[in-house]
Amino acid sequence: MSTQAVCEKCGGTGWIIVERASVSGAERCVCLTEGRAERLEERSQIPPLYRNASFENFKTEGVQELKSVMSAVKNYADTFPVGPNPGLLLIGGPGTGKTHLAVAALRRIMEKGHEGVFTDYQTLLDRIRAGYDSSSNSSNKEAYRMVLDSEVLLLDDLGAHRVTDWVQDTVTSIVTHRCNNRKPLIATTNLPDAEAGSRTTQKTALGVDYLHTLRENIGDRARSRLFEMCTVIRIDYNEDYRIRRGKRF
């Protein structure tokens, strides 16, 4: 049976007695903060694929646009939580490195001692729906409370779910709650947004129209609140970041 070493400074109490100007007082021992970033990362639910994502290992390959995007995301993380907006929204096509940069920002923020949670949009909604109780008209409270209450939430692939009224109502309630309470939200999306400068297209397959804008997939209210609280960064780069990164191995 292993035993955990007791701090020699505080004897395991977490507090030490200090004297300043002949006045005694207590302050937190450094043992409470040592390793805090590591503990926060263990609880963050970041997928193994992105667990080591950082600004240092993001491959820009000399592309100025990617350098500018990384610089903007890094600035958000470095100035957190005193930046102009509590949230960050990364818009770009699949494979543009959005998730890597979002996780890099979250990890940098956690290094400062803030708690963060990663969740995939579709998985989150599926978890909430799976726990839905029609008799009480309530959903999976654990998953729902997590995204409402977490200090910093990273929501990956925002809008990547079949559109229904329930989906739009759920994402609206989450975004609105976090916006009203100034709880930081980092989000990524493949969906274009005309007002963010994206080209928007409508695709049709087998006679069915598929909606391809952020507004149509999450609704007007959620989109409005999202843009209100977030610094919006659009990534226009055609080469797949995953393929480009793979060439390095």
Describe the function of each predicted region:
Residues 1-68, 237, 243-249:
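A short, basic N-terminal segment
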Residues 84-102:
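Walker A/P-loop nucleotide-binding motif
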Residues 65-70, 110-149, 162-165:
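Short glycine-rich substrate-engagement loop in P-loop NTPases that contacts/grips substrate
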Residues 59-88:
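Pre-Walker A (pre-P-loop) alpha-helix and adjacent loop at the N terminus of AAA/AAA+ ATPase modules
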Residues 114-115, 149-152, 181-187:
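Loop/turn-to-beta-strand initiation segments
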Residues 100-114:
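P-loop NTPase Walker A phosphate-binding motif
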